Amino acid sequence: MIGELYEHALAGRARPEIEHTDGSRKPLPVDGWLRESPGDKSILDRCEGPTLDIGSGPGRLTVALSERGIPALGIDITPYAVDLARSSGALVMLRDVFDRVPGTGRWTTALLADGNIGIGGDPAALLRRVAELLAPQGRALVELEPPGSPLRREQVRLCHAGSASAWFPWAYVGADHITDVAYDAGLGQVDIWTVDGRWFASIGGCQVCAERTLVTLLPNAYRPARG
């Protein structure tokens, strides 16, 4: 999908940008994936029980969970990222989230950090898949775009020095859209918080079959996390 340019970025040999179909570009934030980032502690503190780190990349969060004594498995589709994570001591598999995943139906927490709610370009479909992976009372922890950001489903690619990857589907979900996305996926209550300029949601993994669970997205619902 993103292949060689992504691997070069992880190895420090390139600084690719994400290009959108309208021609706009922004830097690929690879530095934050290679080391602890502000706000990581907040989402790690909410991981309970066996945790699946989806799109684990070079494995910083998978390693951090293991160091806390939390059983954690990372999955990623990029061989070099998997190798990096394993070299740091993480338990990681080369696996697509939509393929067969060990422990299906038994994970207590599923982690979609660093914008990985965008995987596949269809956030509701991704959350439906996550619900299959979770235990009945499990939860998904998801990183979001700030409030006011649109819900976008589009094609993007990586570009650097005249080279470009193939286009691939991706999505961006603003904090004030995640309740609707979770509802479309048939999931439960959404709790949103912010810390260190990052936005997150905890989403109940149990399927809702009748009444919609609403979270009022008013300014006082966006509360800074402590610690």
Positions of predicted regions on the chain:
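A short glycine-rich, Lys/Arg-flanked "PGG" loop and its adjoining helix->strand segment in the class I
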Residues: 124-136
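Conserved SAM-binding strand-loop segment of SAM-dependent methyltransferases
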Residues: 89-99
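A short SAM/SAH-binding and catalytic strip from SAM-dependent methyltransferases
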Residues: 107-123
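S-adenosyl-L-methionine
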Residues: 1-46
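Short alpha-helix
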Residues: 168-186
